Regions:
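Helix-to-loop junction immediately C-terminal to a conserved catalytic motif
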Residues: 48
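Conserved ABC transporter NBD signature motif
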Residues: 56-69
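Catalytic Walker B motif of ABC-type/P-loop ATPase nucleotide-binding domains
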Residues: 146-150, 155
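ABC-family P-loop ATPase nucleotide-binding domains
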Residues: 78-133
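The feature captures the beta-strand-to-loop junction immediately N-terminal to the Walker
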Residues: 33-35
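ABC ATPase "signature
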Residues: 205-206
Length: 229
């Protein structure tokens, strides 16, 4: 279990995440939903161990987030993080050397599914192709926690189905999958649990089906109600 207890992150006078508490259980796909600047990315970075909370605790299987937990967490940020000169094959080799849980066989299978070839250079990729490459890299790890920050950003409508199918294929009883997005309609049929974050605070969370039943609204319509200006 991945557990966040009263987690807060402040940058000077700005509070990016405020008192967040949530338990992420294996075998489920979670969606962190919210508009830009709501705190989704900051929360993910704290779970990944890239940013330290100002207060509160984050643990994975009872172990505080740190050096020991990083090897069990795969985190895909929104930014591109590959050198331009690298090809897909270079990137696969780099990750295989760096992460013991990285599978080159899975990686090449994902590349094929995403219509990417080993000789493609990072410098020549569109934003959509880069998004699919980042996804292939992270899904090829056998990590306990897989976090994907805005995995559908820059991906066209046709390719979104490829991305979603790839995520579903990775789901298993021993893995926690967390995705952040503001493209809620694309994720509604996939997610097991929805977390609505606004101004750094969780304003609603729960099993997706229970939320629909209790509100009489789809996750998409709940999103519109919560984030309507």
């Amino acid at each position: 279990m991945l557990q966040c207890k009263n987690v807060t992150k402040k940058y000077m006078k700005m509070t990016a995440v405020n008192g967040v508490s949530i338990d992420f259980m294996p075998g489920r796909i979670y969606a962190l939903l919210g508009s830009n600047g709501s705190g989704k990315t900051t929360l993910m970075k704290m779970v990944a161990g890239l940013v330290k909370p100002t207060s509160g605790d984050i643990t994975l299987s009872g172990v505080p987030i740190g050096v020991e937990t990083k090897k069990h967490i795969a985190y895909m940020p929104t930014e591109s993080y590959f050198y331009n000169y690298m090809s897909c094959a270079d990137i696969g080799k780099y990750y295989a050397d760096f992460f013991e849980d990285f599978s080159l066989d899975q990686y090449y299978n994902y590349l094929n599914e995403m219509k990417l070839t080993p000789d493609m250079k990072a410098s020549k990729m569109s934003s959509g192709m880069m998004a699919k490459l980042k996804l292939a890299v992270n899904l090829s790890r056998n990590a306990s926690v897989i976090m994907l920050d805005e995995p559908l950003n820059g991906v066209d409508i046709v390719a979104r189905e490829q991305v979603i199918n790839a995520v579903i294929s990775k789901a298993s009883p021993d893995k926690i999958i967390i995705m952040s997005s503001h493209l809620v309609d694309e994720l509604e049929a996939v997610i097991d649990y929805a977390v609505f974050i606004k101004d750094g605070v969780i304003v609603s969370q729960g099993d997706a089906e229970n939320l629909r039943t209790a509100s009489g609204m789809s996750i998409v319509d709940q999103y519109k109600r919560i984030y309507a200006y």
